[in-house]
Each structure stands twice: as C-alpha cells, then as structure tokens.
Curated annotation (Swiss-Prot):
Residues 28-103 form a propeptide. It is found in: Secreted. PANTHER family: UROTENSIN-2B (PTHR36876:SF1). Disulfide bonds join C107-C112. Potent vasoconstrictor. GO terms for biological process: blood vessel diameter maintenance; regulation of blood pressure. Keywords: Cleavage on pair of basic residues, Disulfide bond, Hormone, Secreted, Signal. The gene is Uts2b. GO terms for cellular component: extracellular region. Residues 1-27 form the signal peptide. This is Urotensin-2B. Its main location: secreted.
Amino acid sequence: MKVFSTSLWCGLLTLLSVMNLFKSVRGRPHLSSGHELFPAKEHAAQEKLTRNPGLQRPFHAGGDLPSKLEELRQVKKLRDWIMEAKNTGLSNALDNLSSSHTKKRACFWKYCV
C-alpha cells in the first residue's frame, strides 16, 4: 500500500509540474497569483476577445462577400444536381431490380410457385 501511495504522489507531482511547464511556455504561468477566480463581468468579455484573436472580425471581410455568396449559390446548385442524380440513379436501379424479380419464379426442386 505504501508503494502505491508513493507512486500516486510522484505521479501527481509530475503531472502538476508538466502542467506548470506547459502553461509557462505559453506565457501564462498556471500557479501565479495574477489570475482572479471571478473576474469582473465587464472585463471578462474583453479579456476573452484579446486572448482569442480568431474570434475578432477581420477588416477585409466585407470585400469578398459578393464572391462568397456567388460561390455558395454554385455549391448549392451542385449539391442539388448531385442529389437529383443519386435519386434518379437509385430509382432506376430499383426499377431494374423489381422488373427482374417479377420475371423469375421461385422454384424448389421441381416445384415452382
């Protein structure tokens, strides 16, 4: 039991050390006292936006909007065309399958139904 307890503590210490190392490599130490547990609500949203620059809207997004809309329309047309082709192909296959089954008769030895 003592060996299990010792290995558990060593594993926990190693895990915390690695977590602290990764956080400090990213520029924010994990165990520092600079972070508040419950930050003020008016500052929380701004901090989240500054931490995640991918959430901020780029300035050049409006210039490509008409071309993106046209591309979206073309993709929708292509999707509809593919779905229509699949549906017609499937219905043709089902028609061929059902027509071939009506011509065949179920036979067992010399008795056919």
